[in-house]
């Protein structure tokens, strides 16, 4: 039985709640001592993990819609992607304001360049910013064939973001490895597409170098 447009609308409402409830919990935890001994790190890791969850959920939609034969499920992909960007922005903001502090924001650029795991994180965020900004149908029409080329960069985020997480933790624990494993699995489901993209990219680079 295929999902109807009405059911997808309610699914979108549920996904909005899924994006909002973690924020409400975080606010409650901050105000009621629900965080650990290092609340700043806890906030950073919580916002980062939530962004990763929405990234993985976004990547899950296409294969799920295909294998479950639920084409309308694709309509939820943009929503999940925007929540991923929102939580990634909270993650970056928590680092800038809580880790560095308002008085030290001038150091942000230096930190992002000199710390490799932060470099991976900011590259991922910039890509997500571009994808969020161009996610509307109007931008899709305006960009034409270039729209899909741009949005293929989500696969690069799926590689960089888990590495950023793994690199940022002091002690390797199962959790970042699980996120990395899920990202690899979701990318593996797109093996043929990724191989085609890589071949096309390699050909373009070769042609430019040959000029």
Curated annotation (Swiss-Prot):
Database matches in InterPro entries: Fe3_Rdtase_TM_dom, MsrQ-like
Keyword Cell inner membrane: yes
Pfam families, per the entry: Ferric_reduct (PF01794)
Highest taxon in the source lineage: Bacteria
Membrane topology: Multi-pass membrane protein
Cofactor(s) listed in the protein's UniProt record: FMN; heme b
Localisation per UniProt entry: Cell inner membrane
Cofactor note: Binds 1 FMN per subunit.
GO terms for MF: electron transfer activity; FMN binding; heme binding; metal ion binding; oxidoreductase activity, acting on diphenols and related substances as donors
Key words, A-Z: Cell inner membrane, Cell membrane, Electron transport, Flavoprotein, FMN, Heme, Iron, Membrane, Metal-binding, Transmembrane, Transmembrane helix, Transport
Primary localization: membrane
Gene Ontology cellular component annotations, sorted alphabetically: plasma membrane
Membrane spanning residue stretches: 17-37, 82-102, 116-136, 153-173
Family note: Belongs to the MsrQ family.
Task performed by this protein: Part of the MsrPQ system that repairs oxidized periplasmic proteins containing methionine sulfoxide residues (Met-O), using respiratory chain electrons. Thus protects these proteins from oxidative-stress damage caused by reactive species of oxygen and chlorine generated by the host defense mechanisms. MsrPQ is essential for the maintenance of envelope integrity under bleach stress, rescuing a wide series of structurally unrelated periplasmic proteins from methionine oxidation, including the primary periplasmic chaperone SurA and the lipoprotein Pal.
Quaternary structure, from the entry: Heterodimer of a catalytic subunit (MsrP) and a heme-binding subunit (MsrQ).
Name of the protein in question: Protein-methionine-sulfoxide reductase heme-binding subunit MsrQ
Gene it is expressed from: msrQ
């Amino acid at each position: 039985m295929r999902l109807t447009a009405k059911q997808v609308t309610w699914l979108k409402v549920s996904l909005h709640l899924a994006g909002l409830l973690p924020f409400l919990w975080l606010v409650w935890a901050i105000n009621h001592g629900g965080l650990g001994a290092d609340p700043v790190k806890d906030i950073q890791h919580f916002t980062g993990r939530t962004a990763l969850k929405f990234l993985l959920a976004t990547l899950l939609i296409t294969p799920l819609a295909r294998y479950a034969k639920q084409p309308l499920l694709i309509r939820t992909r943009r929503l999940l992607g925007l929540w991923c960007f929102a939580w990634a922005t909270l993650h970056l903001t928590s680092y800038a304001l809580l880790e560095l502090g308002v008085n030290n924001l001038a150091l942000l650029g230096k930190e992002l360049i000199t710390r490799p795991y932060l470099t991976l994180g900011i590259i991922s965020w910039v890509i997500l910013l571009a994808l969020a900004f161009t996610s509307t149908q109007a931008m899709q029409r305006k960009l034409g064939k270039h729209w899909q080329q741009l949005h293929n960069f989500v696969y690069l985020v799926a590689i960089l973001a888990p590495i950023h997480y793994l690199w940022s933790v002091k002690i390797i624990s199962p959790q970042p490895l699980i996120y990395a494993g899920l990202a690899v699995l979701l990318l593996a489901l797109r093996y043929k597409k990724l191989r085609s993209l890589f071949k096309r990219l390699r050909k373009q680079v070769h042609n430019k170098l040959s000029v």
